[in-house]
Each structure stands twice: as C-alpha cells, then as structure tokens.
C-alpha cells in the first residue's frame, strides 16, 4: 500500500482499526511501553502489578474495549520538569500504562504511513534517526559555508497544536472512522482544544506530522536554489527545535529574507507562533553563534588555517548537569561515597555520551575536575580529617578503586559524514 501512496498523492488508507485492535499489535505496544518503563499514570497501576495479574488478560480487556468502542482514555498525570536547571518548567503528561498501550498500538499502525511522507531534514523521534545525525547535518552545512543562520524558536509549540488542523492532516491519509474517533478521544482527554501532551506515546508522530508542510517547503527551497552539485540552503529539525542555514555569499542576501518570509507564512497557516525575542538571524562569518539540540555552534579557524564548524555543550547544559550532581552530593552528605558514585555515574555517562560527538574536550575537562573535587570533598567530610582525603585519593584511586565514571573520550568522526541529498519535492 505504501508504494501506492508514493505514486498517488491523494491515496488514503482504510481498514486500519482492525489492525490496531489485534492482540499481536497490543502485545508489541505493551513491550514498547515496558521497555521505556516510566512511572505509573493517574490510576497508579504499575508494570509489576500487571505482570502479577497476567499480561494477556490485561491486553484482552483493552482489546475488548477497543472492539466494542467502550474504550475511554484516562486523564494523564502531570509532572513538572525543570528546564536546564532554571526556574521555568516543562509539563510532562504521564498516561496510564493502559493508555500507553493503546497509543502505542495506534502509532505502530500510523507511523509507517506518515513516515513515507516525512522529509529528510526532520529527525525528531523517527525510526532509525538520531539527534546526533541532526547535529552533524548542521555542522556539515557550516562546513559548506552556509553561515547565515535563521535560529528559530517556536513559542510553546506542543501546547498550541490545533486539534482541528491536526485531524485534517491525519484525514488526508487515513480513511477510517474508528481510527479518527480514537485519535479524537486521545486528544480530547487533555481537556483542551489544542496541544499534544509531551509524554504521550503518539505525540511525537503527531507533532512531526503537524510541521511536515514546513519541512516540505524547506526541502523545496533546497531544490529550487540548487546549482549542481551545490546547495545554498540547508535545515535540520528535531521536534520543535529548528535551524535553517543559508549560503552567506552577497549574491544570496535575498535568499535568507525570502526563506524567512516563506517560513513565517507556513507557520501562520498552522497558527504556530514564533518567539520573536529568542529568534534571530545569525552571521557566523561575523563571529555569531547559535544553539541547536543543546550544542552551541560557531565557526572557528582551524589549525590548517581553514574555517570549520565548532560545536560544544552550551553553558546552560553544563550548569544544569552540575546542579543536578550537586543536589545528589547534598542529599547524601553523610552517606558512603560508593553510594554517591553509584548515583552520579549513570547521569555522567548519559550526558557525556550525548555531547561526546562535538568539540567538547574543554567542557569535559571542567566537568571531570569539578566531579573529582566534589568526591574528594565528600571523602574529607566522611573522615572528619580536614585535608586528608584530598591528596590521599589519587585519580587512580578515584577511578580505579571507587569506580568513578571516567570515559570522557570524544567520539566525533574524523570527518563530517555525508548528508544524503534531499529528495525531490512535488
């Protein structure tokens, strides 16, 4: 059927709901939910409780409700997550496991349909695509002298997705009343007429679909301004984080303005607001910088006297990490250091693994020295002998005997990977 869709732009899929309701689909959705783990929803039901009472009976009950059209989603539990250690928070919605399974089943059926329509520059929460690929795509564009950058910030994007417009986009490809009814119920469970809940299983797919026409416009801009083998426009989007990079040669001065204007027109159609205070056009050739996916990008003169992209963790990300670690040390001030290290190691490992693809050596050295200092301070307080713990514990002792995380190696490739040429846009 996907081949039909490719050749027929108006192709609509039908008979999908029966696949959503199949036990094999629900089983796979349950395994996906369990793999991601997460806290229980508003009903307090845990995976342990489900396993104890029987997974098959749990899934069979869901299937019966779906088939009889008696399924109704519960309200999601809300949890506030601090943004980069600051005062602002992001509200995370935590559905019940039951609702995660239903959303997962719906995603399993709908995702292949919409994946066939998504564009090369979109990376967020898509199969076989990673944030690192988006990071590299931007770095390669800078390496290709695309140094005029539209750094775009969308105001509360997930909270402002219009349900009516979103459902229209789904209906262009889905001709199944039961699927549409189920999707409407999931959206209405938020109690609002707009917004997709951050934390919902199907939300990333829907948020990508909502911005797909923006992606399509940008891919068309890449193609229409292409002069083989060169492109003069490039972009990358990961969910609501988006940057557009344009060749800064004086003859292309008009291009940045034209792309920005078209971008505003497409976003206005979707009723997506641009945060004007945080959005800007940056000229990397004049020393400007911008952030994308936690990295701060700029252009520097390399040892070979050639300009190259430089991207490292932005200061807010480092500050947020240290604040999180500091709180763990504070909460465990009287506990053995081994227990503290057991808590901070996974945090360090995850943070370092993400940022190891960039020019992060200076930042990593700072973090490593800071962590060493905190661990030695903890050892001194534990022994109540001022100064003893500091020199007694060499780096070999900290990393060898105590097992403090120590893999701060960079994993950046020797050369920037080739970005696949954009597909033609019809």
Language model regions located:
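Charged, compositionally biased N-terminal leader segments and the immediate start
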Residues: 1-24
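Core structural elements
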Residues: 21-26, 73-77, 84-85, 187, ...
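Short, charged alpha-helical motifs in flexible N/C-terminal segments and linkers
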Residues: 34, 38-46
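Conserved polymerase palm-domain catalytic core
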Residues: 58-61, 65-80, 117-284, 289
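Short, solvent-exposed helix-loop connector elements
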Residues: 91, 122, 194-198, 326-340, ...
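A conserved non-catalytic segment of reverse transcriptases
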Residues: 188, 270-336, 347-349
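Short secondary-structure subsegments characteristic of cysteine-rich extracellular domains
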Residues: 358-381
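Extended C-terminal regions of large enzymes
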Residues: 372, 379-426
């Amino acid at each position: 059927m996907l081949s039909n869709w490719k050749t027929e732009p108006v192709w609509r899929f039908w008979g999908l709901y029966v696949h959503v309701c199949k036990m094999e689909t629900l089983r796979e959705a349950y395994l996906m939910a369990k793999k991601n783990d997460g806290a229980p929803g508003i009903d307090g039901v845990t995976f342990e409780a489900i396993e104890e009472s029987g997974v098959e009976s749990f899934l069979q009950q869901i299937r019966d409700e779906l088939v009889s059209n008696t399924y109704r989603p519960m309200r999601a539990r809300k949890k506030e997550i601090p943004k980069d250690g600051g005062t602002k928070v992001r509200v995370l919605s935590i559905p019940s496991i039951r609702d995660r399974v239903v959303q997962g089943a719906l995603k399993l059926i709908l995702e292949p349909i919409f994946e066939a329509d998504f564009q090369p520059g979109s990376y967020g929460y898509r199969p076989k695509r990673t944030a690192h690929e988006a990071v590299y795509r931007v770095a390669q564009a800078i390496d290709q002298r695309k140094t005029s950058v539209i750094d775009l910030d969308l105001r509360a994007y997930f909270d402002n997705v219009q349900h009516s417009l979103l459902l229209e986009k789904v209906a262009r490809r889905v001709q199944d009343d039961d699927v549409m009814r189920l999707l409407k119920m999931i959206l209405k469970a938020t109690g609002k007429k707009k917004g997709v809940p951050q934390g919902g299983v199907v939300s990333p797919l829907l948020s990508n679909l909502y911005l797909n026409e923006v992606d399509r416009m940008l891919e068309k801009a890449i193609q229409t301004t292409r002069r083989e083998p060169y492109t003069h426009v490039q972009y990358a989007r990961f969910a609501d984080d988006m940057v557009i990079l344009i060749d800064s040669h004086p003859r292309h001065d008009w291009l940045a303005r034209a792309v920005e204007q078209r971008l505003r027109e497409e976003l206005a159609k979707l009723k997506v607001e641009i945060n004007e205070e945080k959005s800007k056009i940056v000229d990397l050739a004049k020393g400007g910088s911008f952030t994308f996916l936690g990295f701060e990008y700029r252009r520097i003169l390399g040892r070979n006297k050639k300009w190259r992209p430089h991207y490292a963790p932005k200061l807010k990300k480092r500050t947020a990490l240290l604040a999180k670690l500091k709180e763990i040390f504070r909460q465990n001030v009287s506990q053995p250091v081994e227990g503290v290290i057991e808590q901070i190691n996974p945090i360090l490992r995850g943070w370092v693994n993400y940022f190891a693809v960039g020019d992060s050596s200076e930042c990593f050295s700072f973090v490593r020295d800071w962590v060493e200092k905190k661990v030695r301070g903890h050892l001194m307080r534990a022994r109540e002998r001022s100064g003893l713990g500091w020199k007694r514990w060499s780096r070999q002792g900290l990393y060898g005997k105590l097992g403090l995380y120590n893999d701060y190696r960079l994993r950046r490739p020797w050369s920037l990977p080739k970005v696949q040429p954009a597909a033609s846009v019809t």
